[in-house]
């Protein structure tokens, strides 16, 4: 725990599993109070119970602005506003480019890109009102390179990277913007791939390669604990054995 993190309030989207849940644990251990946002309310309620009095669970879908506004009101009332926002909610619906995948494409754009933008728009005033803070956007190694079957997913992450750099310039010095670009991580992302052959191949690829969600959470905790005079703008974290 450090003076820069003790008592601060962190809002984490997609907090029901994977990187989101691991980040909640890491930030709580560093002295943050945490607001856990996700659709699977049973999971975040269990996690809030595990973390104790400084944690609240709020059912919210990042594609639903009204739900986000209600969540922000609860954070303000119960925790005193937001100091750190972690835009973690996302889906990775890989597959060959085809009209059969158009619902997946729309969902990725709405969750990965527009969801992060809307969440930030809703919570940014609280961060400013609290004297500034940290905005953490979870991107991907796919935000640096595109490959077959990940085109639209990569497009959403390239979008996150470009938008984040614009925000960094616009919001400094009061709000620090950090982009985290994970490589293969052992999460539930592959569970939701609808293209059967792609799902099987992706799961096989990450099975023995993936790093743990806690590895990314540790990086996030490190970034937000840095002295205010500095910002870690972009952090690429890959398994040591990941080729690209």
Predicted regions and their residues:
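Conserved glycine-rich cofactor-binding loop
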Residues: 16-17
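Conserved glycine-rich Rossmann-like NAD(P)H-binding loop of the short-chain dehydrogenase/reductase
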Residues: 32-47
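The beta1-alpha1 cofactor-binding region of Rossmann-like NAD(H)/NADP(H)-dependent oxidoreductases
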Residues: 60-70, 102
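Substrate-binding pocket helix/loop in short-chain dehydrogenase/reductase
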Residues: 96-97, 101-106
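Active-site helix of classical SDR
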Residues: 120, 156
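Residue(s) in the substrate-gating loop at a strand-loop-helix junction
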Residues: 140
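C-terminal helical subdomain
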Residues: 179-180, 199-244
């Amino acid at each position: 725990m450090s003076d820069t993190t003790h008592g601060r309030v962190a809002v984490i989207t997609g907090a029901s599993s994977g990187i989101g849940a691991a980040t909640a644990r890491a930030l709580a251990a560093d002295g943050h109070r945490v607001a856990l946002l996700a659709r699977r309310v049973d999971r975040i309620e269990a996690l809030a119970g595990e973390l104790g009095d400084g944690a609240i669970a709020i059912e919210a879908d990042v594609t639903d602005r009204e739900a986000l506004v209600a969540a922000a009101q609860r954070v303000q009332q119960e925790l005193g506003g937001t100091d750190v926002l972690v835009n973690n909610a996302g889906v990775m619906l890989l597959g060959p480019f085809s009209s059969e995948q158009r619902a997946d494409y729309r969902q990725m754009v709405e969750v990965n890109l527009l969801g992060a933008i809307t969440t930030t728009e809703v919570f940014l005033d609280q961060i400013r009102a609290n004297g500034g803070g940290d905005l953490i956007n979870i991107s991907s190694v796919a935000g640096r390179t595109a490959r077959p079957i990940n085109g639209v997913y990569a497009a959403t992450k390239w979008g996150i990277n470009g938008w984040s750099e614009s925000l960094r310039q616009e919001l400094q010095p009061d709000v620090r913007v950090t982009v985290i670009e994970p490589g293969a991580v052992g999460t539930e992302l592959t569970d939701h791939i609808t293209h059967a052959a792609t799902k099987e191949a992706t799961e096989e690829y990450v099975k023995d390669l993936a790093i743990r969600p806690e590895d990314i959470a540790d990086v996030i905790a490190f970034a937000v604990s840095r002295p205010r005079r500095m910002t870690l703008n972009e952090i690429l974290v890959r398994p040591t054995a990941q080729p690209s």
